[in-house]
Regions:
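N-terminal glycine-/charge-rich "phosphate-binding" loop or analogous flexible N-terminal tail
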Residues: 1-38
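Short, well-ordered coil/turn residues at beta-beta hairpins
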Residues: 6, 43-44, 65, 171-174, ...
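Glycine-rich adenosine-cofactor-binding loop
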Residues: 7, 88, 96, 115-136
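NAD(P)-binding Rossmann-fold cofactor-contacting core
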Residues: 10, 137-154
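Phosphate/diphosphate ligand-binding glycine-rich loop within oxidoreductases
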Residues: 39-112
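Rossmann-like adenosine-cofactor binding region
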Residues: 49-50, 149-241
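Oxidoreductase and adenylate-handling cofactor-binding alpha/beta cores
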Residues: 96-112, 137-140, 267-276
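Rossmann-like dinucleotide-binding domain for NAD(H)/NADP(H)
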Residues: 199, 205-349
Length: 349
């Protein structure tokens, strides 16, 4: 079996070698000529998997080691009989810990009060559910908005208007969809900002195009929102530098980039390929966790407080500072991202 693999997928080489011949290429450069004689692809979001790439190839299986799959032409896959899979939930806890750390920093800067604040979670799938669990442990009141789940008759959800009326923080965890009953493309637009009541903080760790960045810049300038934390950008890998300078934190699409989340995605993608071809492999092993060496201690909490411990473990300001210093290096900052383990000890936070 011959597998073409994005060379930035971590923790994969030893395991992939057990499946067959593995060829590693830059994800954005994988071409039709490269995949013509491949049996499977393991990719990330930078590889567009469609007719132009796959027609005439012998590819039977495409696995993306990511939650998102808008880079995969699923209609073509079905038409061509090519199996495909994504990795739902692989980095859910990583994104949730990013949001948690960002909220602690926002509280330390006086933008929010963690005690009793109301958080609106827009999109309550794997990631949104993990965010909900962590924030409930912090004592936050949660309002949940997820129209597809609500349409299936599930309970405990509110309309977007309730989010706009009552929330001090709104955090986005939707997929990017352009069609269907509940499209998310530019769902956060000028009309959304005009209907806000409480000058909330906006967090986008979902997909960049869920937010109309022009409207977001206007909302920041006019004070319709207090500030923003942006991890995903509308025109990635190009970052709007004016917006980057205006937000509280701006990071290079790394909320889900913990080593644990990456390894989960790698393992799930390899498992899908192995199942499809009736083979097996040994799962990758992660190195031990290390404290973040970013020198920051929150003013509002003692060094022994669990929130201080969480920030010592991972402080997103490091990633924000790196992007502000070199916004042109968006892809490099992602590709060369340092080891970051999830803090399993925060189960009690």
């Amino acid at each position: 079996m011959r597998i073409i693999i994005d060379d930035k997928i971590p923790f994969i080489r030893e395991a992939a070698a057990q499946l067959g011949e593995a060829v590693y290429l830059s994800g954005s450069d994988i071409s039709a000529a490269d995949v013509r004689d491949a049996d499977a692809l393991i990719v990330r979001t930078r590889t567009r998997c469609d007719e132009a790439l796959l027609q005439g190839s012998r590819v039977q299986m495409v696995a993306t080691a990511t939650i998102g799959y808008d880079h995969i032409d699923t209609a073509y896959m079905q038409h061509a009989g090519v199996a495909w899979t994504n990795c739902p939930g692989c980095n859910a806890d990583s994104v949730a810990q990013y949001v948690q750390s960002a909220l602690i920093l926002l509280a330390d800067a006086g933008h929010v009060d963690l005690a009793g604040m109301t958080v609106g979670i827009v999109g309550v799938g794997h990631v949104g559910s993990s965010v909900e669990r962590m924030l409930r442990r912090m004592g936050c009141r949660i309002l949940r908005h997820d129209p597809p789940r609500q349409a299936r008759g599930e309970e405990g959800f509110v309309d977007l208007e309730e989010i706009q009326k009552h929330c001090d923080v709104i955090t986005l965890h939707t997929p990017l969809t352009r069609e269907g009953a509940h499209p998310t493309f530019h769902m956060i637009d000028e009309q959304f900002f005009d209907a806000l009541h409480r000058r909330p903080v906006l967090i986008n760790a979902a997909r960049g195009e869920v937010v109309d960045e022009a409207a977001l810049k206007t909302a920041l300038k006019t004070g319709k929102i207090r500030t923003a934390v942006i991890d995903t950008w509308e025109h990635e890998p190009c970052v709007d530098r004016e917006l980057l300078s205006a937000v509280f934190l701006g990071t290079p699409h790394i909320a889900g980039y913990s080593a644990d989340g990456k390894a989960n995605g790698t393992r799930m993608a390899l498992q899908a390929v192995a199942r499809h071809f009736g083979t097996s492999f040994s799962a990758p092993v992660l190195p031990p966790a290390l404290p973040d060496d970013y020198a920051y201690y929150p003013q509002r909490y003692s060094p022994q407080h669990p929130y201080a411990e969480l920030l010592r473990h991972y402080d997103p300001r490091r990633d924000s500072d790196a992007l502000r210093a070199h916004p042109e290096d968006f892809e490099r900052l992602r590709g060369d991202y340092p080891l970051r383990r999830e803090m399993q000890a925060n189960d009690g936070i």
